[in-house]
């Protein structure tokens, strides 16, 4: 049976309150354990609207029919009013996710600010953002945070160095092909990385595939994937407007003898045997701006 890591990104307040319970129900029905990464601070995702001035982002929003896909409340969150604190109000859902047998990790304190400003933040600012997120998630789940996946895959060597002090068991901060040990700025090796290898819905819809053909498209990608495959879904998409389609995909995956699992299950017993690599800034198909991408050492 082929194993594929299933990563669930929770970016927004509504994605938490509506998408998480629905996905927990769907995953329980199929007896699947996944890795959930929560945004825990203010939901300011609506402040991404200024990026509509950038052609690549505008095209992404148009081809994915973002208003219908996400809903206006998500697209406008934190614009005309302060963003609601997610973990403060909804921390019980993070604890519920953990109690359901899933891995729970940190995505971001402020998802929008991380994507917009991480490349310019000082070391102190980076540290503050991660610490705010870790502290809020610890408060919500009542135990240490074992894993993390930065917002929008916006990570480079500076980010990795800052995250070392938080003692995560693994990170999933980049796009790539297989788990590896990243080289830090001082030449030492950092916490193991488990890259996302497969495309997300919003990266390919309207470019490589029509909406009605997406399930077969991504299933074919899974069947043909090499390395150590990892697939990312979002509570705002697969847990809401596309939840029916996602449930159908799980049935298709099962018929192909593919099993989804939490990301930590993809690691070998001895991580010292993993290859060494780097995370570098790079453009990525279907995304606007730079992402952290795996590079062989």
From Swiss-Prot:
Keywords assigned by UniProt, alphabetized: Antibiotic resistance, Hydrolase, Lipid A biosynthesis, Lipid biosynthesis, Lipid metabolism, Lipopolysaccharide biosynthesis
Entry keyword annotation includes Hydrolase: yes
Which is an annotated GO molecular function term of this record?
Answer: hydrolase activity, acting on carbon-nitrogen (but not peptide) bonds, in linear amides
Positions of the NodB homology domain: 2-261
EC class, as a word, reads: hydrolase
Instruction: Name the chemical reaction catalysed here.
Output: 4-deoxy-4-formamido-alpha-L-arabinopyranosyl di-trans,octa-cis-undecaprenyl phosphate + H2O = 4-amino-4-deoxy-alpha-L-arabinopyranosyl di-trans,octa-cis-undecaprenyl phosphate + formate
Name the domain of life this protein comes from: Bacteria
Q: Does the keyword Lipid metabolism apply?
A: yes
Q: Name one GO cellular component term.
A: membrane
Q: What is a biological process (GO) this protein takes part in?
A: 4-amino-4-deoxy-alpha-L-arabinopyranosyl undecaprenyl phosphate biosynthetic process
Protein's pathway: Glycolipid biosynthesis; 4-amino-4-deoxy-alpha-L-arabinose undecaprenyl phosphate biosynthesis; 4-amino-4-deoxy-alpha-L-arabinose undecaprenyl phosphate from UDP-4-deoxy-4-formamido-beta-L-arabinose and undecaprenyl phosphate: step 2/2; Bacterial outer membrane biogenesis; lipopolysaccharide biosynthesis
Q: What does this protein do?
A: Catalyzes the deformylation of 4-deoxy-4-formamido-L-arabinose-phosphoundecaprenol to 4-amino-4-deoxy-L-arabinose-phosphoundecaprenol. The modified arabinose is attached to lipid A and is required for resistance to polymyxin and cationic antimicrobial peptides.
Protein name according to UniProt: Probable 4-deoxy-4-formamido-L-arabinose-phosphoundecaprenol deformylase ArnD
Which lineage is the organism of this entry classified under, starting from the top rank?
Answer: Bacteria, Pseudomonadati, Pseudomonadota, Gammaproteobacteria, Enterobacterales
């Amino acid at each position: 049976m082929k194993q594929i890591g299933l990563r669930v990104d929770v970016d927004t307040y509504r994605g938490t309150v509506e998408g998480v319970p629905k996905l927990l129900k769907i995953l329980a029905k199929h007896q699947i354990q996944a890795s959930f990464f929560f945004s825990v601070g203010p939901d300011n995702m609506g402040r991404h609207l200024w990026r509509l001035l950038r052609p690549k982002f505008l095209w992404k929003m148009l081809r994915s029919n973002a208003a219908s896909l996400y809903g206006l409340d998500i697209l406008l969150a934190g614009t005309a009013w302060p963003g609601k604190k997610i973990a403060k109000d909804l921390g019980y859902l993070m604890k519920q996710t953990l109690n359901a047998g899933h891995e729970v990790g940190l995505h971001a304190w402020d998802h929008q600010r991380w994507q917009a400003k991480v490349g310019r933040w000082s070391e102190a600012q980076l540290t503050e953002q991660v610490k705010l997120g870790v502290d809020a998630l610890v408060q919500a789940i009542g135990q240490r945070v074992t894993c993390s996946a930065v917002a929008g895959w916006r990570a480079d060597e500076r980010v990795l160095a800052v995250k070392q002090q938080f003692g995560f068991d693994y990170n999933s901060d980049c796009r790539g092909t297989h788990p590896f040990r990243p080289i830090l700025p001082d030449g030492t090796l950092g916490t193991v990385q488990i890259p996302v290898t497969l495309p997300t819905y919003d990266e390919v819809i309207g470019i490589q595939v029509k909406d009605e053909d997406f399930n077969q498209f991504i299933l074919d990608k899974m069947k043909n994937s090499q390395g150590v495959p990892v697939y990312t879904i979002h509570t705002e998409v697969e847990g809401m407007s596309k939840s029916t389609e996602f449930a159908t995909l799980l049935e298709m995956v099962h018929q192909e003898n593919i099993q989804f699992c939490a990301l930590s299950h993809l690691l070998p017993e001895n991580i010292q045997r993993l290859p060494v690599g780097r995370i570098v800034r790079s453009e990525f198909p279907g995304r606007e701006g730079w992402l952290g991408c795996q590079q062989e050492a």
